[in-house]
Amino acid sequence: MGKKSAEKTELVIVTGLSGAGKSRAVDALEDIGFFCVDNMPPKLIPTFVKLIFNSNEKRDRVAIVADIRLGDSFSDIFGVLDELKEDEINYKILFIDADNDVIMRRYQETRRKHPLADEFNTPSILEAIQKEREILLPARLQADYIVDTSNVTSSQFKERIAKLFLDNASSSLKIYSISFGFK
């Protein structure tokens, strides 16, 4: 793989608790120019990254979401991260977290089922959240950034993500004006 491509591309692995705000994080990353892929099986990440690096299309910023929805294959993420390090591919891990009460409230508001509810026969959302915390603990410990969404608004969360991943040079306001005439 071309080392220059790997050095130029910013790779972010997004993970965290279900209901904590990973989808909003992806939206925020897309808004600041990231190419985002959600729910990618970890074993596909090295191949995908190599394709991105060797592509003719310019992809300077890539974010990949890998989380518990992948079931047992999520545990492959740690071997994959080691493989990326061996290939000298730099990446950052963004872990999205929230308090149990906040996540429970979000699930009750959306009336969605927690991804682990069926897998572990947990009738309680709280039990599913606690089990997910156990499973994700190694990822949280390796995270470069941990963002807690418990007490922030959507716009504050988006701002935090932007501050983490925008450098001073690119944080200035850019205005593009495009016009055309038709006769």
Language model segments and positions:
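C-terminal accessory "lid"/substrate-recognition subdomains
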Residues: G2-K3, E127-K183
